[in-house]
Structure formats: C-alpha cells, structure tokens
C-alpha cells in the first residue's frame, strides 16, 4: 500500500544522489 508512495520517493532520492555524486565527482576532481 505505502509502496506506491515510498517507491517513487526512493527513485527520486537515488537520482538526486547520483546526479550530485556525478556533478561533485566531475568538478571536484577534473583530472581524475
């Protein structure tokens, strides 16, 4: 029942974290 609400939230948080990690990793260590 609550899966319908929790699942999209988990997907959204995962996407935000991944984008943040990609952005920080790409700009914090441009040579890496």
From Swiss-Prot:
Keywords: Cell inner membrane, Cell membrane, Membrane, Stress response, Transmembrane, Transmembrane helix. The lineage of its organism: Bacteria, Pseudomonadati, Pseudomonadota, Gammaproteobacteria, Enterobacterales. InterPro entries: YoaK-like. NCBIfam families: YoaK. GO terms for cellular component: plasma membrane. The chain crosses the membrane at residues 3-23. It comes from Escherichia coli (strain K12). Induction: Constitutively expressed, may be induced at pH 5.5, repressed by thiol oxidant diamide (at protein level). It is a single-pass membrane protein. This is Uncharacterized membrane protein YoaK. It is found in: Cell inner membrane.
